[in-house]
Amino acid sequence: MSSSYYVNALFSKYTAGASLFQNAEPTSCSFAPNSQRSGYGAGAGAFASTVPGLYNVNSPLYXSPFASGYGLGADAYGNLPCASYDQNIPGLCSDLAKGACDKADEGALHGAAEANFRIYPWMRSSGPDRKRGRQTYTRYQTLELEKEFHFNRYLTRRRRIEIAHALCLTERQIKIWFQNRRMKWKKEHKDDGPTAAAAPEGAVPSAAATAAADKADEEDDDEEEEDEEE
């Protein structure tokens, strides 16, 4: 072959390219309407119609991209964004439910902590509107109080505080117990004569002497506290 063949072919190629850009309409690059914007098929056809010398639109090599895209049409591609949003909705709902469950778990733990919280006698309300109930003592507390009463029917304030701390009771509870115990002891020894007013056997005289100041105040409340216990 002569070199003129290649020159002529090259010249004809550039000539076709020149005619291509000369015949191209300026509106071919404008945006397509909304009905054609969902895919590139309609836009490609419109552009190809303006440049017939470039390629054949009807050729199977230049088919619409929707025809070769997994058998889906243009409508399927247009619904993809909505499908992605629908898939995110269950995730958002699950996150909200998880937050509610976390709050419920925190409330349950807080309630369990309050249930295990120990309430001491001095933490209870002592106002006039509080309904009083009968105080119950354990066997250990009763035994220690009986031992103390065997030696001293009347307690000093200092000794009362010591017993209250040792037995986890309040001073008022110690005072009421001793008042009721003295009333019981007086009823038991009512018919014994003048010796009933004496101290119990084994009592320490010095302790009775130091409790003389508290005796007058406690005897005034004996009958009232006895009625409360009954």
UniProtKB/Swiss-Prot annotation:
Q: What is the lineage of its organism?
A: Eukaryota, Metazoa, Chordata, Craniata, Vertebrata
Cellular component terms (Gene Ontology): nucleus
Question: Where's DNA bound on this chain?
Answer: 130-189
Motif Antp-type hexapeptide is found at 119-124
Sorted alphabetically, which keywords does the UniProt record give? Developmental protein, DNA-binding, Homeobox, Nucleus, Transcription, Transcription regulation
Q: What is this protein's record name?
A: Homeobox protein Hox-A7
Organism, per UniProt?
Answer: Pan troglodytes
Give the Pfam families listed for this entry.
Answer: Homeodomain
Q: Which domain of life is it from?
A: Eukaryota
Instruction: Give the function comment from the record.
Output: Sequence-specific transcription factor which is part of a developmental regulatory system that provides cells with specific positional identities on the anterior-posterior axis.
Residue ranges with Low complexity bias:
194-213
Question: Family assignment?
Answer: Belongs to the Antp homeobox family.
User: Taking the first listed entry, what is the main subcellular location of this protein, grouped into a coarse class?
Assistant: nucleus
Please state where this protein is localized: Nucleus
Any single GO BP term: anterior/posterior pattern specification
